[in-house]
A protein has these predicted regions:
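Proline-aspartate-enriched helix->loop->beta-strand connector
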Residues: 1, 10, 125-138
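Flexible loop/hinge segments that line or gate small-molecule binding clefts
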Residues: 2-41, 161-162, 170-171
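Short, acidic/turn-prone active-site loops that include or flank metal/cofactor-
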Residues: 17-20, 117-118, 141-143
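Second-shell loop/turn segments in exported
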Residues: 20-25, 36-50, 87-93, 174-181
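Structured C-terminal subdomain patch of bacterial secreted/periplasmic proteins
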Residues: 25-34, 131, 135-197
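Basic- and aromatic-lined ligand-binding clefts that recognize polyanionic substrates
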Residues: 47-107
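A local structural motif
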Residues: 107-117
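Short helix-initiation/N-cap motifs at beta->coil->alpha
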Residues: 116-125
């Protein structure tokens, strides 16, 4: 508990991306800010700035690649970032206040759940089918990525979704999207490699 540590003079650094409430509208700038903070705390400001520069270059390279391929498309592909329950059950979608939002935007994809005024929310099969994303990115915390990808077919009505019909499904470890950390840049590159070639 933070107050107990503070009362005995032990400093505590809380990672806002992992706290309840977290960062309201996360983005790549939050990743860079956290690296700067850790650089200060551990007296490694130069290394932090070097890492930030590398991450900024990688994001800029992806955005340039996406801008180049966007001119070849009539309209951007739509996408949903989901956290399904393997074996059936609740499916969650990532909305406007998640790291998935800036990640999809940088990847040149339009989040079909951008109107969700939450980080993550439970969605019904009907709602998912009605939004008909071109691309599905399914996140998982553990287990077999193929099983997670296959779990999409357990959701009633998904056989009519464009992403399923066109086999545009990517299973990714959750930490490649959530929370806002340097791994979100790895996830961005993976999404673009999969869907924007």
């Amino acid at each position: 508990d933070a107050s107990a540590l503070s009362s005995v003079g032990i400093p505590l650094l809380e990672e806002p991306a992992l706290c309840p409430g977290g960062i309201e509208d996360p983005g790549f700038d939050d990743v860079y800010d956290q690296l700067r903070l850790y650089g200060e705390v551990f007296d490694r400001e130069d290394e932090a700035e070097e890492n930030i520069g590398e991450l900024e270059d990688r994001v800029a390279a992806v955005e340039e690649q996406v801008d180049g391929s966007a001119s070849d498309q009539e309209e951007p592909l739509t996408a949903a970032v989901l956290y399904p329950t393997v074996g059936g059950g609740t499916t969650y979608a990532y909305g406007a206040h998640s790291m998935a939002a800036p990640q999809l935007e940088a990847a040149g994809l339009e989040n079909v759940f951008a109107d969700l005024d939450e980080r993550v929310a439970e969605v019904t099969p009907e709602e998912l089918a009605g939004r008909d994303p071109d691309v599905l990115i399914v996140l998982y915390s553990e287990g077999d990525p193929q099983a997670v990808e296959d779990s999409i077919s357990d959701i009633p009505g998904t056989d009519g979704i464009s992403a399923v019909a066109e086999d545009r499904i990517l299973a990714m470890p959750m930490n490649m999207t959530e929370p806002a950390t340097p791994q979100a840049v790895d996830g961005l590159e993976r999404i673009v490699e999969e869907f924007q070639q």
